Amino acid sequence: VPELRALIGEVAAEQLERSGSDDPRGVSAALRVCFTRLMKSEKKFFVDQLNMLVKRISQEGKDTSGSNGDLLLRLHSQYPGDIGCFTIYFLNLVRLEPGEAMFLGANEPHAYLHGDCVECMACSDNTVRAGLTPKFIDVLTLCEMLNYTPAPSSSKIFPATQSQLDPSVYLYDPPVPDFAIMRIETPASIKLYLVSAVDSASILLVIQGTAVGTSTAAASEMTLRRGSVLFISANESISLHLSSPDGMLLFRACCLL
């Protein structure tokens, strides 16, 4: 992408090109230099280069998949003149199917571009933005804190495991102790379902279906439908009286202590 190359400069671009897969530290260092030069570009310069790239891709009239042309044009239409449009060339483009999940460690840049997902993250007060946003971008902190270790997108995707105790539960258990996600799918044949107690507090989100919930901690019955969110105390179970003809789909965030 010549417009991106103009922004990061020939020296940095050649350094990245010379970095081999057998030298991960060298690749990381080169990526850091290139990304930092991009993010520190003078606004008029990167806006001019972005407009040139958009014009070139729009006029090519052919397959632009090699340069993520369709994605670039869509993002530019949503965030015109945003430096984040160029960051797609540093990231993997991942399309998740329903039920799939991925785990991103601390300081790994990412962006949700389209669709809906359930996101859970560790407690943090240092969310730093890189672009594709009208909010403040702290460039110096961002470039310093990021993890520049390259990896294929397949290494970030991990499957859910079906519970041996409850076949309706699929567990997404990431390699950190901060949180876990449960996907609960109840078939239409089940009219009474028990959300089992766990040792931590948890949050229950209803994606599909309707039910009336009861628990020893609740003073009255709770009507649950699409979009309902329920806080469940530690060691508390919830009985769901299902009324949906298509069953229910719920997600539960908790800690596995």
Where are these regions (language model features)?
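Transition-metal
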Residues: V1-K62, P134-K156, I181-R183
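Glycine- and acidic-residue-biased ligand/ion/polar-headgroup-sensing regions
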Residues: M39, K43-F45, Q49-N51, S58-I83, ...
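Short catalytic-site patches enriched in acidic/histidine residues
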Residues: G66-V118, C123-V128
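Short acidic-glycine-tyrosine-enriched beta hairpin
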Residues: L93-F103, E108-A111, V118, I184, ...
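C-terminal, non-catalytic macromolecule-binding modules
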Residues: G115-L171
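A short hydrophobic beta-strand segment most commonly corresponding to one strand
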Residues: G115-P134, F179, F231, S244-L257
